[in-house]
Design a protein with these regions (language model features):
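Structural signature of outer-membrane beta-barrel channels/translocons
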Residues: 62-64, 68, 121-127, 169-175, ...
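Predominantly the C-terminal beta-signal and adjacent terminal strand-loop region
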Residues: 78, 84-85, 113, 131, ...
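Short loop/turn motifs that connect adjacent beta-strands in outer-membrane beta-barrel proteins
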Residues: 25-35, 51, 68, 125-132, ...
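Transmembrane beta-strands of outer-membrane beta-barrel pores
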Residues: 41-47, 77-81, 122-124, 138-146, ...
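Helix-adjacent hinge/juxtasegments
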Residues: 90-143
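Short glycine/proline- and aromatic-enriched beta-strand/turn motifs that initiate or cap beta-hairpins
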Residues: 9-64, 216
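Outer-membrane beta-barrel translocator domains and adjoining extracellular loop/strand segments
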Residues: 50-54, 84-90, 144-153, 196-204
Length: 217
């Protein structure tokens, strides 16, 4: 039951995002809301004993429902870099059972993931002047390799992960004539949860803190 918890949460987020696509397309066809797009680049440093550094590029497409509120859906690519400890090798564990790792699969210190998320963004201040923004992304991220990802003293054993990423920063318009175009610079936190193997199966929580830079139009 515990092994299916993270997967169920990630799958629920995936289907929620898919169901929102039609709701976001309808305003575009009717012209009732303003379309907006974002491209963001992030680098985050892993925190804690079990950690991973993350480099991420994402794009978000959606609609501005008011000057202060945007909602959309997004996707991207992220590289996860780990610094594993080598005090444990689960491949040599004689106590393996049906919940443990698969010795036929390889291990890696770098993982490539695809995040899919719903994005909520709140702007504070006039869109024509420098102001603050608060961004919240909720979704799932998927490990695209069959290799186990070495983290800490064990291994990430599930490809579907829960994904949460809030950010706080400055929105800087590029021109008075077209305030829809702006640069965004902020501080980001990312939470990723999955399954983990270290002599037995357990939950894995990854925390990372870093910076995000982006462009909106």
């Amino acid at each position: 039951m515990m092994a299916s918890g993270s997967a169920a949460m990630a799958n629920a987020q995936y289907y929620a995002i898919a169901n929102q696509v039609s709701q976001l397309i309808q305003p575009a066809l009717s012209g009732s809301f303003n379309y907006k797009g974002y491209v963001d680049v992030s680098y985050l440093k892993g925190l804690g004993d079990r950690n991973a550094d993350i480099f991420e590029i994402t794009t978000t497409q959606g609609f501005r429902y008011a000057d202060w509120f945007f909602m959309g859906i997004g996707a991207g690519v992220e590289a996860m870099f780990t610094n594993p400890q080598h005090s444990f090798d689960g491949w040599d564990d004689p106590e393996q059972d049906s919940w443990s790792i698969d010795p036929s699969r390889s291990r890696s210190k770098t993982g490539w993931l695809i995040p899919l998320f719903t994005d909520f963004r709140f702007n504070f201040g006039s869109p024509k002047s420098v102001g603050f923004f608060l961004d919240l992304r909720v979704g799932a991220t998927f490990l695209v390799s069959d290799n186990y990802l070495e983290i800490g003293d064990g291994y990430m054993t599930r490809s579907e992960c829960f994904y949460l990423k809030p950010a706080l920063g400055l929105r800087i318009p590029l021109s008075d004539s077209n305030p829809k175009q702006a640069l965004n610079i902020g501080v980001s936190y990312q939470l990723t949860t999955s399954r983990y193997w270290y002599y037995q199966s357990s939950d894995l929580t990854l925390n990372a803190l870093g910076v995000t830079m982006g462009f909106e139009w």
